[in-house]
Amino acid sequence: MKNILISLGGNCSTNNDLIKEQFSDIIGVDNGAQHLFNRSITPNVVLGDLDSIDPSLLKQIKTMEIDIKSYDSNKDKTDFELAIDSINKPNDKKIYLIGGEEGEVDHLFSIFSIISNYEFAENLTWFYQDKTIIFKRNISIEMKKGSRFSIIPITNLKHLKITGAEWELNEEDLNSGSSKTLRNISNSDVLKISCESGLFCLIY
């Protein structure tokens, strides 16, 4: 499965060690391209309405072998959606996101909303500040004992089970947006989360 990196606009403070060679395609979304250049990573695609990218950076990009896809600002999709649409067969890719931090609150909520509607949501990983955000239905993940994590039900969850945590659940139904599974603590080296149906977001 190939890896795709998408760098969103807004702030980007992740300290995740990104290596260009890990990714088959690298997409800079508007001023998200700046985050890539700051990390000495050259995108092969820069797209969006390009209204927030630094003019000097855009000028530099135009001299490079980078595919530029410019869209009118009056469009029906966000730049993030356009980035996803540009990926060939996203169901077969692992998609990693950086950026998108501390921008306008509607942009933040739209990213979560957009991801939850994709059938390949489980393929996405978002490195947000010092956290990792993933979207899953079932997961068994190694986690240092004492680590904090939160589970956010993106949809209604049926028979949610959590083991390896301070506050465990045994096949409990939770409604979308429930706060019951926020701010938990791992008490084992392996955290297991599963549900019969539904999609949740794990932040750790």
Residue ranges of predicted features:
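General beta-strand structural signal in soluble alpha/beta enzymes
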Residues: 27-30, 70, 125-128
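Active-site/ligand-binding-proximal alpha/beta "capping" segment
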Residues: 82-94, 99, 170
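Long, charged alpha-helical interface segments
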Residues: 136-204
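N-terminal beta-strand-loop-alpha-helix module at the start
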Residues: 1-60
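Short glycine/serine/threonine-rich phosphate/pyrophosphate-binding segments
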Residues: 14-15, 77-80, 104-109
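Short phosphate-binding loop-to-helix
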Residues: 68-90
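Anionic-ligand-binding alpha/beta catalytic cores of soluble enzymes and soluble regulatory domains
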Residues: 94-137
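Histidine-anchored nucleotide/phosphate-binding helix
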Residues: 32-37, 83-84, 111-115
